[in-house]
Amino acid sequence: MAMVTTEAAAAATTAATAAAEKPQDVEKPDYAPYNGASTTADGGTGARARRGDGGGGVVDSVVARWRREDMLDKSPLALHAAAAIFAFVALVLVASNQHGDWMQFDRYQEYRYLLAIASLALLYSLAQAARHAHRMRGGVDPVSSASARLLDFVGDQVVAYLLMSALSAAVPITNRMRSAVVNNFTDATAAAISMAFFSFVALALSAVVSGYKLSKQTYM
């Protein structure tokens, strides 16, 4: 009985020693996020992703702006070249529309007026197209930048309005002729009116572009 008691006391002593030597688990304090920012790896990755998305959006907006400015810079040349081509075709159709007797364009003041305005539109559009082509090739614009946009805006509008007035004069008489007879003379005048209208559309679009540039022009 004494031996059993001694062994039990020895076992209890050994268990107490082992418990004393075992290091206690240190409870780590919970740290609150600083200024509400996430301290996890996922939070850092999300922040980097958000920064990357923002940078890509800025680059896309800059590229889109460059493309828009490049299109606005090249459009006057294309529009004036198109206006010159349509005006030239209208001019040729009217000038060559001579078939004798009453089928002579010069017997009608409406067609003479259309011929004169088509000639003016051709000369103006050619001059503007040549100026813009020279500028885009790196040459010096003969018109100062401060006055160039105003010149484009006013010139395009004036010539476009003149073309519209010529069309308004030529359309009624052509309709009356075609209601009575349809021949080469009336077909040629109708085709000339169509070409003059396309020239008007090109100059009207050019006036819109030049007006937009003029509204964005800075004077400081």
Curated annotation (Swiss-Prot):
Extracellular side: 96-109, 174-188
Membrane-spanning segments: 75-95, 110-127, 153-173, 189-209
Lineage, broadest ranks: Eukaryota, Viridiplantae, Streptophyta, Embryophyta, Tracheophyta
Subunit structure: Homodimer and heterodimers.
Alphabetic keyword roster: Cell membrane, Glycoprotein, Membrane, Transmembrane, Transmembrane helix
Protein name: CASP-like protein 4B1
InterPro entries listed in its UniProt record: CASP_dom
Spans within the Cytoplasmic topological domain: 1-74, 128-152, 210-220
Predominant location category: membrane
Compartments in which it is found: Cell membrane
Alphabetical list of PANTHER family matching this protein: CASP-LIKE PROTEIN 4A4, CASP-LIKE PROTEIN 4B2
Glycan attachment residues as annotated in the record: 184
Organism annotation: Sorghum bicolor (Sorghum)
Region (Disordered): 13-56
Bilayer topology: Multi-pass membrane protein
GO cellular component, one term: plasma membrane
